[in-house]
Amino acid sequence: LGRCPVETLKRHPFAILVLMRCMFNLRQIPKMLELKELLLASAAEHPEWPEEEKGNLLGECDLILSFLMYNDISAMSRLHRSASRQMSRPAISIQNSGGWTFGSPSVLMMFHRQPGQLEQELAEMDECMPHYYKITSGHGMGAETIMRAEADFLRGRFDDAQIGLERAYAQIAGNGQTNMTLCCDFLAWRLSLGGGYT
């Protein structure tokens, strides 16, 4: 990347988006933010670009930046809504077959962060995820349903947890997102141990 001339990168803004995501995955956050500034400069230098294309570029930039806000649902949601408003097509930097949970077997363990705030976090997931699904072709489908079912399980509401689990299984059926299936399977296993379900 260091050997690629800046002017070449500026001529290929979609490549900048993919590189931003790669830098995030490699934990090269300063380089990721440097690429973001390059993308913004490139968009500003090209007023002739169609507004739809600019919206897609800037919206996807917001989507990628949202990962820096993990696991703050409110902060991530602001960027997802911004991306959703600007984008007219699905993101190119995120494949819906890729992992959504970064290997975690639990959505709740990923996003519940403050004691006493679980209801608010669940509501934020319900509000946030449709925007995220819209711009990622359903990547992580069922996350909010799984999180709510896990919350019901932890509250001892085993029947509600089982119903939520079945809803989640139905939501993710056939979408190829194994990581979401594993979250469901993990909850099903816990229910079989603690709730009398098999």
Where are these regions (language model features)?
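Long, low-complexity regulatory tails in eukaryotic proteins
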Residues: L187-R190, T198
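Repeat-solenoid scaffold signature
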Residues: I16, G195-T198
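Internal alpha-solenoid helical repeat scaffolds
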Residues: E7-L187
